UniProtKB/Swiss-Prot annotation:
GO terms for biological process: protein insertion into mitochondrial outer membrane. The gene is TOM20. It is a single-pass membrane protein. It is found in: Mitochondrion outer membrane. It comes from Solanum tuberosum. Forms part of the preprotein translocase complex of the outer mitochondrial membrane (TOM complex). This is Mitochondrial import receptor subunit TOM20. The N-terminus is blocked. Residues 1-169 are cytoplasmic. PANTHER family: MITOCHONDRIAL IMPORT RECEPTOR SUBUNIT TOM20-1-RELATED. InterPro entries: TOM20_imprt_rcpt, TPR-like_helical_dom_sf. The keyword Protein transport applies. Central component of the receptor complex responsible for the recognition and translocation of cytosolically synthesized mitochondrial preproteins. Together with TOM22 functions as the transit peptide receptor at the surface of the mitochondrion outer membrane and facilitates the movement of preproteins into the translocation pore. In mammals and fungi, the transmembrane domain is located at the N-terminus while it is located at the C-terminus in plants. The overall orientation of the protein in the membrane is therefore inverted. The chain crosses the membrane at residues 170-190.
């Protein structure tokens, strides 16, 4: 059932991406559409291997920056861009490189919160980002995320294995939180648009 749900999400956001691409060809200055496009790419990135995921996150970043060029005060685009930088952080083992993304994410979340202080999600994003460097170190303590994500069992002591599992759990908690939040924005964005939603999955 969970696999079916994941597949439905994949189909939905692929549909969203293609629809946004079509709309962009008709109106490249639609900031709402660019934001939805970036959000859909960010969602789809979690279904890809690490290298492809990084590229998709970069594409999402490009679309969100384009949206902000059209409308610099668009706080939902700022927030999504912060999530894109955060996603990039946890796929980047090098702390110096990751620090650049940390700073960009914090700046985006702060600007989004300043533009809409009543938005609880923006406030929580700022709080989580403040803890992100510590979580990043925990995740990459045993090597790059590619290794952390590997399914093969550890041949080291049970203590190290436990720590590795904890790191993996942390990674999925963080990445899952980011993706879930972006997914909510994308769903709401498409609900507000005139585009009919994709057909519901057949009853189980």
């Amino acid at each position: 059932m969970e696999m079916q749900s994941e597949f439905d999400r994949l189909l939905f956001f692929e549909h969203a991406r293609k629809s946004a691409e079509t709309t962009y060809a008709q109106n490249p200055l639609d900031a709402d559409n660019l934001t939805r496009w970036g959000g859909a790419l960010l969602e789809l990135s979690q279904f890809q291997p690490v290298a492809e995921s990084k590229q998709m996150i970069s594409d999402a970043t490009s679309k969100l920056e384009e949206a902000l060029t059209v409308n610099p005060e668009k706080h939902d685009a700022l927030w999504c861009l912060g999530n894109a930088h955060t996603s990039h952080v946890f796929l980047t083992p090098d702390m110096d490189e990751a620090k650049v993304y940390f700073e960009k994410a914090t700046q985006c979340f702060q600007q989004a919160f300043d533009a809409d202080p009543s938005n609880d999600l923006y406030r929580k994003s700022l709080e989580v980002t403040a803890k992100a460097p510590e979580l990043h170190m925990e995740i990459h303590r045993h090597g790059p995320m590619q290794q952390t994500m590997a399914a093969e069992p550890s041949t080291s002591t049970s203590t190290k294995s436990s720590k590795k599992t904890k790191s993996s759990d942390l990674k999925y908690d963080i990445f899952g939180w980011v993706i879930l939040a972006v997914g909510i924005v994308a769903w709401v964005g498409f609900a507000k648009s005139n585009m009919p939603p994709p057909p519901p999955p057949p009853p189980q």
